[in-house]
Design a protein with these regions (language model features):
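N-terminal Sec-pathway targeting helices
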Residues: 1-16
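Membrane-interface motif at the C-terminal end of an N-terminal transmembrane signal
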Residues: 15-32
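Conserved beta-strand hairpin/beta-sheet module of binuclear metal-dependent hydrolase folds
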Residues: 32-84, 179-191
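Alpha-helix C-terminal capping segments
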Residues: 46, 105-112, 178-182, 217
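Active-site neighborhood of phospho(di)ester-bond hydrolases with catalytic His/Asp-centered motifs
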Residues: 66-68, 90-102, 116-118, 169-172, ...
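Active-site HxH/HxHxD metal-binding segment of metal-dependent hydrolases
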Residues: 72-75, 82-153
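Cytochrome P450 C-terminal beta-domain/meander region
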Residues: 151-164
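Metallo-beta-lactamase
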Residues: 164-171, 175-217
């Protein structure tokens, strides 16, 4: 019996180790997230654990966010607002790239913000549908508590103060994944990743509904 238990334990460790190596390989070569980097004037990256958000200047003490991070307490984004001598009410709009929990956790901290996204993503966010990726499907359906206040059309342009944001529907990572073009920067969320070589690669297959579809955009 003892030998059987040892054998089962070794098998479990092998499976877990192989799974970990597989996931690690999916992220190999990704460029690091540089907190505080500014890819364009009026655009600042904020690192929140293993993900990032972007703060976009909208003029007159107003900002918009691309995504809202993985921390429900929003420590990183609140610190960035404080650095600008702004409070939560300065956030007038949040543009969500998709509905996975690591990109929308702090939305509730900004009650004055309009929340933008595509209708195809709403079922994932309200729990009527679950993620479909090979790994994330095991997380099951979950109501994030986040709702869009404005549903976008593909190619729509939105104005927030002095900022204009053009929205594109790019299904693949999730059914309603979005890309946003603002201040000359294209924000792709998890639909693509920057590499150490200065190129981009497609969505990570393990967490994507349809990584082949994501590569078509």
């Amino acid at each position: 019996m003892k030998k059987v238990l040892i054998g089962l334990g070794a098998l479990v460790l092998l499976i877990v180790g192989s799974f970990g190596a597989l996931i690690a390989s999916a992220f190999a070569g990704n460029a690091p997230i540089v907190d505080g980097s500014e890819p364009a004037p009026g655009v600042r990256q904020v690192k929140d654990g293993f993900v990032s958000m972007f703060v976009l200047d909208a003029g007159e003490g107003q900002v918009a966010l691309i995504d809202a991070g993985t921390d429900p307490e929003g420590k990183a984004i609140l610190a960035e607002l404080a650095r600008r001598k702004l409070g939560p009410d300065a956030v007038k709009a949040i543009f969500l790239t998709h509905g996975h929990g690591d990109h929308l956790a702090a939305v509730h901290l900004f009650p004055k913000a309009d929340v933008y996204g595509f209708g195809a993503e709403a079922p994932l966010m309200d729990g009527t549908a679950g993620p479909r990726g090979p790994i994330v499907r095991f997380f099951g359906k979950k109501d994030s508590g986040v709702r869009f206040t404005h549903l976008l059309a593909d190619g729509e342009t939105t104005t927030v103060g002095s900022l204009t944001v053009k929205s594109f529907l790019i299904p693949g990572h999730t059914q309603g994944s979005a890309a946003y073009l603002a201040r000359g920067v294209l924000f792709l969320g998890d639909s693509a990743a920057a590499t150490n070589e200065g190129t981009i690669k497609g969505a990570v297959w393990a967490f994507s509904d349809d990584s082949a579809q994501a590569r078509l955009h």
